């Protein structure tokens, strides 16, 4: 924490810039593959594997149980294959608690994502930093407010691109990712352990996540009028 504070004092003494996700350079939001029931097959080796909403846990990790496989003749765009540093997000569901679930993709692999899913692809900002923002209360509160304006549980491109996020200097982003990933790994390692200990570690991660992502907004410089 002390290192973050020192970096903020050195690199962002006047505060941190906030920008809409859609205004960040090289930002893309891609919706998933749509297919028919009769295009599903049972052979994992002969088709294309599809990740759906149930493949992201409520704790924002990938779950490879119950993978759907579709025929190779289904029309798929190249950009719909998952790539390293993608943020996979649940964009549509009958249950509002599943909307906005995210998982981070650590490597390129031969999976696509279904029509009720989306992928956020971003380069100008550390994508792992953005992932942690999407797991935070910052995004949850924004989502609750945005979805209250519609009766449909659908996270569309407009909602996402208007999400305001903090953009601290890259060195600060990297340091925050390093700290939060350590807590996240500890929580994951304990999943087979004592429930009380798992709960305590999860609360610790959530506490530091909210604390580390609470930035003072950059105050625009105002010219002093001369008499």
Predicted regions span which residues?
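Charged, alpha-helix-forming regions
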Residues: 1-227
């Amino acid at each position: 924490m002390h290192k973050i504070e020192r970096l903020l004092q050195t690199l962002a003494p006047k505060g941190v810039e906030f920008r809409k996700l859609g205004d960040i350079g090289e930002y893309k939001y891609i919706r998933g593959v749509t297919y028919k029931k009769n295009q599903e097959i049972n052979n994992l080796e002969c088709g294309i594997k599809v990740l759906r909403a149930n493949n992201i846990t409520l704790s924002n990790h990938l779950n490879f149980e119950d993978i759907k496989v579709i025929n190779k003749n289904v029309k798929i765009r190249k950009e719909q294959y998952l790539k390293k540093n993608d943020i996979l997000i649940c964009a549509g569901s009958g249950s509002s608690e599943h909307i906005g679930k995210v998982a981070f993709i650590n490597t390129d692999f031969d999976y696509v994502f279904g029509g009720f899913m989306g992928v956020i692809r971003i380069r100008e900002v550390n994508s792992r930093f953005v992932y942690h923002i999407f797991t935070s209360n910052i995004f949850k509160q924004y989502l609750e407010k945005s979805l209250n304006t519609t009766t449909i549980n659908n996270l569309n491109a407009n909602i996402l691109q208007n999400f305001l996020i903090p953009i601290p200097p890259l060195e600060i982003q990297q340091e925050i990712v390093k700290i939060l990933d350590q807590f996240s790994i500890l929580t994951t390692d304990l999943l087979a352990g004592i429930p009380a200990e798992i709960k305590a570690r999860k609360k610790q991660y959530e506490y530091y996540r909210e604390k580390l992502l609470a930035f003072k907004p950059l105050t625009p410089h105002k010219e002093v009028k001369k008499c």
